[in-house]
């Protein structure tokens, strides 16, 4: 099945200009990361234009999206986890233990705190701690980048924030070292009887924490996630007597227990979180042929070594006036996201068959004589040479004498720039790399 693309509507107007500018900026940024040869000082990308000739698309298959398209980003994971963590904790507590908020119950159960609300009414929380609620947003939780500060970038401490406030740089170090937010002389006059009993038991268990929990022998090493556990004031006292009832995905944490770092050396990395597949998700494989007039304007500054090394730099203007492309594109639609990439020649042959097989099938269906093997082999060899089969370029520099350019390195500069354009395209748009558009 073939489809027509309204190239003008897709590439013209404010949206088309904004997309062209984003592509220009992206290519320019990638050139700033390239190691330049000695005779080139810098490369600048000035303009990008889609041209007027549209590509030819031929749909080959409808199928389920690749599994890689379902991987969740870190930002999506932390945002979803924070919202679910805050809402589930508050709703679960109010639903399963409404009687625990009564003052009489809190007074009578000063010894058993396994079901206590970590922030009862009248509890004077520390001004350096954040109560539960909207501040669990990950944008308000900067990761600790200083070695030796508990918290670090581990995700284990993140799940404990629902009971103990914030970890990392937003938790007082005194509370981390002593397991008590009032360990550094903070007043407990406003605490109720139950809270006084909790602080007394913390003092009684201090001998179990005599050894330092922060390893300062190697300041460059990443701190263990065990350092984040005492930062929540009631974890050891709430779960020391008996396990908390209700839904809890994490085991009870006792004082003095050593929790291994899940990302420490020797541990396998956790598999990525995957989005749930839905029936409306789909993916299209289409054969794309393009021989258009897309334009890309660049300038490269060439260094002259006469009369001394790097004596002066001359700008060389390069204009890409068109490309020839032949490949297989993948377009996947998943939950208001469109994922787009191209397949390498090997992957394309594995999914939709090689070009030689397609020619043989079409010839057999039409009862036409099959093409010669030489032509099929040459076409396959041309295709395996790269998705960008040809890049046309024009160069301008300084003055010309007798129709010839004076500088001798112009050809080298052209080959270098075109090789980088080809490399950027294949690294950023060929699977497993892909682009995601929100719609």
UniProtKB/Swiss-Prot annotation:
UniProt GO molecular function: lipid binding
BP GO terms, sorted: mitochondrial genome maintenance; mitochondrion-endoplasmic reticulum membrane tethering; phospholipid transport; protein insertion into mitochondrial outer membrane
Region Disordered, annotated ranges: 70-102, 184-274, 353-386
Residue stretches of biased makeup (Low complexity): 231-240
Coiled coil stretches, renumbered: none
Keywords assigned: Endoplasmic reticulum, Lipid transport, Lipid-binding, Membrane, Mitochondrion, Mitochondrion outer membrane, Transport
Bias (Polar residues): 215-230
Major localization class: mitochondrion
Xref: InterPro entries: Mdm12, MMM1_dom, SMP_LBD
Bias kind Basic and acidic residues: ranges: 197-212, 247-261
GO cellular component: endoplasmic reticulum membrane; ERMES complex
Compartment list: Mitochondrion outer membrane; Endoplasmic reticulum membrane
Ranges where the SMP-LTD domain occurs: 1-439
Domain observations: The SMP-LTD domain is a barrel-like domain that can bind various types of glycerophospholipids in its interior and mediate their transfer between two adjacent bilayers.
Family in the record: Belongs to the MDM12 family.
Oligomeric form and interacting partners: Component of the ER-mitochondria encounter structure (ERMES) or MDM complex, composed of mmm1, mdm10, mdm12 and mdm34. A mmm1 homodimer associates with one molecule of mdm12 on each side in a pairwise head-to-tail manner, and the SMP-LTD domains of mmm1 and mdm12 generate a continuous hydrophobic tunnel for phospholipid trafficking.
Cited function: Component of the ERMES/MDM complex, which serves as a molecular tether to connect the endoplasmic reticulum (ER) and mitochondria. Components of this complex are involved in the control of mitochondrial shape and protein biogenesis, and function in nonvesicular lipid trafficking between the ER and mitochondria. Mdm12 is required for the interaction of the ER-resident membrane protein mmm1 and the outer mitochondrial membrane-resident beta-barrel protein mdm10.
Protein name (database record): Mitochondrial distribution and morphology protein 12
Organism annotation: Neosartorya fischeri (strain ATCC 1020 / DSM 3700 / CBS 544.65 / FGSC A1164 / JCM 1740 / NRRL 181 / WB 181) (Aspergillus fischerianus)
